Regions:
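Beta-propeller-forming repeat regions
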Residues: 1-219
């Protein structure tokens, strides 16, 4: 078993859809090495049509890619305990990975691909119960920015949403903009162009505050 995030690791399973979806779905093992994993994110970083997974947990953030034999390759992005994970691109097409660390944590972090390694840039250390992330080009700069939210449930604090904007093309310097505060305790958020004006908007859901808020992108 597993107690206090030690012992048997969790299992991540893939479900294969049968021709008749009302029948039993077969499962296959994706990975079995993480403890206290809180989030994963589908990506497509290679040239095939199949998606891969970014997953984060106590053992860090990992990229998982399914091979032809059904097993999965894994490559580490970071060994820091992560709770949320999303990916994005710089204007030059370089990949970034954004995380909240640790689970329900205080840090917002951006990892930038640097050769075979990932450079870690800490964007914020003041979150209380960080719980949501998205990467998108909200400002039409040609590269993605990071939006992140926190709940303020444990420890108790005023919740909020912040937008993090890179100040240079290397994504090593950032500026921060506060978007909201106590009105919504962020359980999750998404980026999507809701009014089809070509600009991603931000949809934020609050569980503790029982509300939903849309930040319309008027930039």
């Amino acid at each position: 078993g597993n107690k206090n995030n030690a012992g048997a690791p969790l299992k991540v399973l893939a479900y294969d859809k049968p021709k008749d979806p009302t029948k039993k779905w077969k499962t296959s093992l994706v990975c079995e090495f993480l403890h206290n994993s809180h989030n994963f994110h589908p990506v497509n970083w290679d040239k095939d049509i199949e998606e891969e997974l970014l997953i984060t947990g106590q053992e860090g953030t990992w990229h998982l890619d399914r091979k032809k034999d059904g097993t999965w390759n894994r490559k580490v992005v970071s060994e820091e305990f992560g709770g949320e994970v999303r990916d994005g691109l710089t204007p030059d097409g370089e990949r970034i990975v954004a995380t909240i660390e640790p689970r329900h944590g205080s840090k917002v972090v951006c990892y930038r691909k640097n050769g075979n390694n990932w450079q870690r840039i800490v964007l914020d250390t003041t979150f209380k119960d960080g719980h949501a992330l998205a990467c998108a080009d909200f400002l039409d700069t040609g590269g993605d920015q990071v939006v992140a939210g926190w709940r303020g449930m444990n420890p108790r604090a005023v919740p909020g949403v912040k937008l993090f904007v890179p100040k240079n093309k290397d994504y090593t310097e950032w500026e921060t903009h506060q978007l909201s505060g106590a009105e919504i305790a962020v359980e999750d958020l998404k980026a999507a162009d809701l009014n089809e004006d070509g600009k991603p908007d931000i949809i934020v859901a609050g569980r503790q505050t029982h509300n939903l808020k849309i930040f319309w992108n008027e930039s």
